[in-house]
Amino acid sequence: EYKGRQTEYVDLIINEMIPMVAAEELADYIDVFCDKGFFTVEDTDRMLNAGMKYGLRAKIHANELDYSGGVQVGVKYNAISVDHLECMGEEEIACLLESETMPTVLPGAAFFLNMPYSPVRKMIQAGLPVALASDYNPGSSPSGNMKFIMSLGCINYKMLPEEVINATTLNSAYAMGVEEEAGSIAVGKLANFYITTPISGIEYLPYAYTADLIEAIFLKGEQY
């Protein structure tokens, strides 16, 4: 309906969709895909600004297809996370180093689309934290298997097992704004954890990428 009329569609989002979503308390975040062929930096700036006025925290999907400027506009609005990041240069890394925004990489999407992977080792060596997520969706990452995501982190990002576990737990909790209540086993936090079958060590989790190692799952202290 709005093909070729992107500005009008952005107006619709700002003037109708965001107010309705906020009024009905349907979302905590506003997430914009700022990338080549999708929303521009200017579009993204307008939508994040509108969402902020309604109390929606900014999140960004950006730099999957090109150096889009999405990282910079996300940091401008103190985005809780910027996701994808296959295209990352010195400018983007420096921008994130001066922010509280969590860089989140999505290896499942790069794997499924056969795209280049994010330069995670370069990001870590520069001093950035990194979160790992599945980007579970039917178009570009049709798997929510986080154990496989951990394996991809080790294989394709050259991350250590300890790094992928940290990236899928505490750093991922930070990327959702729930680090005070989840993401690690600590006094005062929710009892969210799983128990594995007997394994030789934590490095076996990403190593045995097709093995079903989960014996029990606990959410808020309740076993499922």
PLM regions with names:
Residues 1-69:
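Metal-coordinating catalytic core of metallo-dependent amide/deamination hydrolases
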Residues 12, 16, 20, 46, ...:
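Alpha-helical scaffold segments in soluble metabolic enzymes
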Residues 20-21, 47, 51, 74, ...:
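Generic structural signal for hydrophobic
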Residues 33, 61-63, 104-106, 133, ...:
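Generic beta-strand/beta-sheet core signal
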Residues 67-181, 209, 223:
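Active-site-adjacent C-terminal substructures of enzyme catalytic domains
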Residues 170, 190-224:
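C-terminal cap of metal-dependent C-N hydrolases
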